[in-house]
Amino acid sequence: MGYEKRSLGSFEGRKIYEILLSLGYDMKSAQRICDKHRVTDAEDQNLHKNSVAHGEIFLIDYKCEPRGLKPIFECDAFAVFDKPSGILSHPSGRNSPYNMYDEIWSLYGQDACVAHRLDLETSGILIVAKDKDAARELKECFEQRRVMKSYL
């Protein structure tokens, strides 16, 4: 897994967020992309949302490289994976190795997220929310301790 740099095209005199909106991103997504410094110019300089484009611009985007790990259970709202030891629950930066998000996003898209974390060395059950509503509900369940976690 990793991030890849792909061209969004060549633009002159337009603000970065306007370009992202014209390419189909909603305002919230465009802002998040800019806030995470994922838009650059040809010299790899980060472009902020109000920066004005002069030439080709690039998006640094997550590239999933799934290995075929499948959920052991799933329903409409969430999925359950048996996370092996030695795999990160989530990426830890742009040079992150294979992690559970390679599987999660390739199966459910980028709105899916882990409901809790397991350490790199820890194997066990990992609950994945398939969308933002499910993520909010699962987070609340963990916060209110309606979900029991145990370690062997």
Residue ranges, per PLM feature:
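RNA pseudouridine synthases
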Residues: M1-L152
